[in-house]
Swiss-Prot record:
To M.genitalium MG148. It comes from the Bacteria. This is Uncharacterized protein in xynA 3'region. Signal peptide: none annotated. CDD domains: DLP_2. PANTHER family: SARCALUMENIN, TRANSMEMBRANE GTPASE FZO.
């Protein structure tokens, strides 16, 4: 996509986000307001989320440390990362802890493990929402945010839950496997979820220094076939490497060690993608976030109407405003389609079809949940029913969206 076309499309998307808060305020749901705020913030900052995902102890944090060129993120023998950690470019080092309450606290770098690890913050007892780290790294474009996530499949179920909830916020994913063992059933199920939500996935097999060249080739061949079967894509490129060796080489400025780690092949491919394809993927990801938000709003309003939780007049006004917003979005989408190449139009159309299907399924699921829940509050007074149903409705919709 040419620069002028990209800028026009991004302006259209930013215009959509200006109206998100208005829509969420009309719906009167704290969960939906929070969702609208997070989408709006990401799009306004033009942030591209490169999310590193994988099972616990695959070496995700070590690989990110290589990208940063420093031992910044805690690593160790036990499962460590317990909260979402975002690293963005900054000329100076800065660490902010954002709590679930919305309060932000700046901390020294050497206190990072007190908030982002199981050792320092077991089961997230400190109620940390995310950690944001500003760091002067030159590995990627300055608008790229590297996201470290808790490993799935450990004894800490909350870590798995946090990571699953972040998948749909990803613009591109680095999926980290390793040679010990190659790919597990847990990882296969995890990858299935990722492939449903993310268009660009880089596959890394870490710890390649722990086995022979012949065994690596066998592992790559086996893993490639498994991934093809899961993603239904024929062109799968896997990068075997040693993140630990690469990091040690970078810190000690040992070029021979870096070359031996095989990380440079992955690094070159990633940089090329960020240079040539990032813009298209980012637009598609932003459109998908907006579509997902509209699906949540639509489901909320439809269920409000069915349950008559809101006064009918207010519901009708909200639905009318929502439909007007939908019409504006669709009109602007038409302009976006004209600016894209033919193949991109096909991709966007498939997105629309997929999201329409998701919206319909969402309404059915939410309605069933509400119907199943209603008997538990049927004997309460009307005002108490409304209060319980409102809370349950918000929770059910956000769970489905996550």
């Amino acid at each position: 996509m040419r620069t002028i076309e990209y800028d026009v499309v991004q302006d259209m998307i930013r215009n959509f986000t200006e109206q998100l808060q208005e829509i969420s305020n009309e719906i009167n749901s704290e969960s939906i307001k929070k969702l609208a705020g997070s989408i709006k913030e990401k799009i306004e900052k033009n942030a591209f989320y490169l999310v590193v995902l994988g099972q616990f102890k695959r070496g995700k944090s070590t690989l990110i440390n290589y990208m940063l060129g420093a031992n910044l993120l805690p690593t160790g023998v036990l499962p460590l990362t317990s909260v979402i950690t975002k690293i963005y470019y900054s000329p100076e080092v800065k660490v902010d802890v954002i709590f679930e309450s919305g309060v932000k606290k700046e901390i020294p770098v050497d206190e990072l493990d007190l908030y982002c690890t199981e050792r320092g913050n077991p089961k997230n007892q400190k109620c940390v929402d995310t950690i944001e780290i500003g760091y002067p790294f030159d590995f990627l474009n300055k608008d790229v945010v590297i996201v470290d996530t808790p490993g799935i499949g450990s004894v800490y179920q909350h870590n798995t839950d946090v990571t699953y909830e972040f998948i749909d916020k990803s613009d591109a994913v680095v999926f980290v496997l390793s040679v010990d063992p190659p790919i597990t059933e847990v990882e296969k199920q995890f990858l299935l979820k990722i492939a449903e939500n993310v268009d660009k996935i880089f596959f890394v097999i870490n710890k390649s220094d722990l086995t022979s060249k012949n065994e690596i080739e066998e592992i790559v061949s086996f893993t490639t076939n498994v991934i093809k079967d899961i993603t239904k894509k024929g062109n799968i490129n896997i990068f075997p490497l040693s993140a630990k060796m690469a990091l040690e080489g970078k810190i000690s400025k040992n070029e021979e060690m870096i070359e031996k780690s095989c990380v440079e092949i992955f690094e070159k491919e990633l940089k090329q993608f960020l240079k040539e394809e990032k813009g298209k993927i980012q637009i598609l990801s932003n459109l998908k976030s907006l579509d997902g938000f509209l699906g949540v709003c639509e489901a909320f309003l439809e269920n409000d109407m069915k349950l008559k939780i809101m006064p009918v007049k207010q519901l009708e006004e909200n639905i009318e405003k929502f439909n007007e917003f939908l019409e504006r979005v669709n009109q602007n989408k038409i302009e976006i389609y004209k600016l894209f190449k033919i193949e991109m139009n096909d991709i966007l159309q498939s997105f629309d079809d997929e999201m329409e299907k998701i919206k319909k399924e969402l309404v059915v699921k939410i309605t069933k949940k509400i119907n199943d829940y209603y008997p538990s509050v049927a004997r309460l007074k009307r005002i108490e029913q409304k209060e319980h149903l409102n809370k349950y409705l918000e929770k059910a919709i956000v769970e489905e969206f996550d």
